[in-house]
Curated annotation (Swiss-Prot):
GO biological process assignments: cell differentiation; male meiosis I; spermatogenesis
Pfam family, any one: Forkhead
Protein name: Forkhead box protein J3
Stored InterPro entries: Fork_head_dom, FOXJ2/3-like, TF_fork_head_CS_1, TF_fork_head_CS_2, WH-like_DNA-bd_sf, WH_DNA-bd_sf
Source organism of this protein record: Mus musculus
Tissue: Highly expressed in spermatogonia, spermatocytes, and round spermatids within the testis (at protein level).
Gene name in the database record: Foxj3
GO cellular component, one term: nucleus
């Protein structure tokens, strides 16, 4: 009994504590704060404390009236009633239980002399209470009751107060027409759709700074779309010349090295050849595609082009596409005062017999593109500054018996997979940076310079467009790869190793290319030119000329100062052509750069530079 008696207080205290805590946190009482509950509470208060105190809350009782005794008590001073109570007293004193605003004013002044001399401020308060208080209802006059102003009455059944609700936010449109950071693809000329069975589609996502490539034939899971971890660097993106929409450019692979900022094109640079082929008439679009693994896309394209030929020769078993992603950026280069045409290469089955290796149009042309792999760049810096004077010769490039260090028209092999970060198309030293070059598989000619030698490039978007156009017209089924067994074996080894080639392996690959081109006569070795020299000072070239051998077109670049040297690793493009007027300087100090393009598709003429250097190269010896 004693224990029970002692336990009772503790149990009671615990219950009280729990009730107190729940009352502090519970919100059940909030919806009960309505006008009706307040009126009922006022009635209880009136019954408990008498009529005198409840008069201040007369507003809460629609039937409250004012006694004459109370009027006499507060006749001399300010009455202790709220404005709502005064309105209630006035309306309830009327036999019709309604009054106009002027009648309410008059009743208050008659019963409480204080308001006669209090000014007009209290009248504003009366109007506010009438319009804001839910207990008062505005009653319009009937037609048979002429007069001014509406009546005010007491609402005996006011609407229940509802809990205030937060206003709904307007739903944001999921897709906005344009964002502050979106770039009009039409103005940039970045859209490209490549037609053709095996031609890839390139896409540049300018918002995310990503470059993408995919095979148009592949769809769904077939086309690699994994995210590209290494997007374009800010420097490379900023260097892209977005204003040069109207000119054609050649591709250059981009290694991670700095270079002068791109400059806007001059009107002379914006001249663009007319493409009369039906393949070229299609609009270039690639903003719709957002495929982001460039490395895997190249491997897929490489397989689609060479798998059949290599499988027949027993040279290659293609492994599954590796998800490893290489740092690739898309870039294209623009010559300052001349249109740089991309250098495709002839896909005829027999190279020795057909030396039109650089036919840019027709069904056999290919855009030159190169993969830039971070593994292959010895220099970690994104860009090496461009050297204004003679660049050091690179020992890593023994594979080039370059006939002219100045001949830098790049020959691309049939494998777009060739990872040469070192194959560089000519870079204008004081011109734009070049972001990386994609490479749809070019036909079987490629001379790669310098293994592991990094250099700096940047370019403009138009070069990418032009390469897309050229790649779209290639008929890959006609390419004869039987004479490139050694090259294909090297490519197969590179593909098996996920293109992680060291410098020695890359040098071997380049050397085998060089040996093949030398044996076939495409490269005429010269004793006066060091083999490890891949580029030299560039000099004015002859005006562009049409070449009759295999619908080639020669596009000359404008002269550069002798002190300005092109970036290291710029590959040769010696052309085997027996054409008058085609000039290339054989000496180390000067060169006439010529770009071969089909004459039928590119009817272009350029004025002859005043300081043109005559060519002393024996073209007959090559043919």
């Amino acid at each position: 009994m004693g224990l029970y008696g002692q336990a009772c207080p503790s149990v009671t205290s615990l219950r009280m504590t729990s009730e107190l805590e729940s009352s502090l946190t519970s919100m059940d009482w909030l919806p009960q704060l309505t006008m009706r509950a307040a009126i009922q509470k006022s009635d209880a208060t009136q019954n408990a404390h008498g009529t005198g105190i409840s008069k201040k809350n007369a507003l809460l009782d629609p039937n409250t009236t004012l006694d004459q005794e109370e009027v006499q008590q507060h006749k001399d001073g300010k009455p202790p009633y709220s404005y709502a109570s005064l309105i209630t007293f006035a309306i309830n004193s009327s036999p019709k239980k309604k009054m106009t605003l002027s009648e309410i004013y008059q009743w208050i002044c008659d019963n409480f002399p204080y308001y006669r001399e209090a000014g007009s401020g209290w009248k504003n308060s009366i109007r506010h209470n009438l319009s804001l208080n839910k207990c008062f209802l505005k009653v319009p006059r009937s037609k048979d009751d002429p007069g001014k102003g509406s009546y005010w009455a007491i609402d005996t059944n006011p609407k229940e107060d509802t809990l205030p609700t937060r206003p709904k936010k307007r739903a944001r449109s999921v897709e906005r027409a344009s964002t502050p950071y979106s770039i009009d693809s039409d103005s940039l000329g970045m859209e490209c759709i490549i037609s053709g069975s095996a031609s890839p589609t390139l896409a540049i996502n300018t918002v995310t700074n990503k470059v993408t490539l995919y095979n148009a034939d592949q769809d769904g899971s077939d086309s690699p779309r994994s995210s590209l971890n290494n997007s374009l660097s800010d420097q490379s993106l900023a260097s892209v010349n977005l204003n040069s929409v109207g000119s054609v450019h050649s591709y250059t692979p981009v290694t991670n090295h700095p270079e002068p900022v791109s400059q806007p094109l001059t009107p002379q640079q914006q001249q663009q050849p007319q493409y009369n082929l039906p393949e070229r008439e299609k609009q270039l679009l690639f903003t719709e595609y957002n495929f982001e693994d460039l490395s895997a896309s190249f491997r897929s394209l490489y397989k689609s082009v060479f798998e059949q030929s290599l499988s027949q020769q027993g040279l290659m078993s293609i492994p599954s596409e590796s998800s490893q992603q290489s740092h690739t950026s898309c870039s294209y280069q623009h010559s300052p005062s001349s249109t740089v045409t991309s250098h495709p290469h002839s896909n005829q089955s027999s190279l020795p017999n057909n030396h039109s290796g650089l036919s840019a149009t027709g069904s056999n042309s290919v855009a030159q593109v190169s993969l830039s792999h971070p593994q292959m760049h010895p220099q970690p810096s994104p860009h090496t500054p461009h050297r204004p004077h003679g660049l050091p010769q690179h020992p890593q490039r023994p594979q080039h018996p370059a006939p002219h260090p100045q001949q830098h028209s790049q020959l691309q092999p049939p494998h777009s997979q060739h990872p040469p970060p070192h194959q560089h198309i000519q870079h204008h030293p004081n011109h734009q940076h070049q972001t990386l070059a994609h490479q749809p598989p070019p036909p079987p000619q490629q001379v790669s310079c310098n293994s592991g030698v990094s250099s700096d490039w940047y370019a403009t978007l138009d070069m990418l467009k032009e390469s897309c156009r050229i790649a779209s017209s290639v008929n890959w089924s006609d390419v004869d790869l039987s004479q490139f067994q050694g090259l294909m074996e090297s490519m197969r080894q590179a593909d098996l190793k996920n293109w992680s080639l060291d410098q020695v392996q890359f040098a071997d690959l380049c050397s085998s290319l060089n040996q093949f081109f030398t044996q076939t006569g495409l490269i005429h070795s010269q004793s006066n030119v060091p083999q490890n020299v891949c580029h030299g000072a560039m000099h004015p070239a002859k005006p562009s000329q049409h070449i009759g051998a295999g619908n080639l077109y020669i596009d000359s670049r404008q002269s550069l100062p002798p002190s300005v040297m092109p970036p290291p690793g710029y590959p040769h493009i010696p052309q085997a052509l027996n054409t008058p007027g085609t000039t290339m300087a054989g000496h180390h100090g000067a060169m006439n750069q010529q770009h071969m393009m089909p004459s039928q598709a590119f009817p272009m003429r350029r004025p002859l530079p005043p300081d043109d250097i005559q060519d002393d190269f024996d073209w007959d010896s090559i043919v």
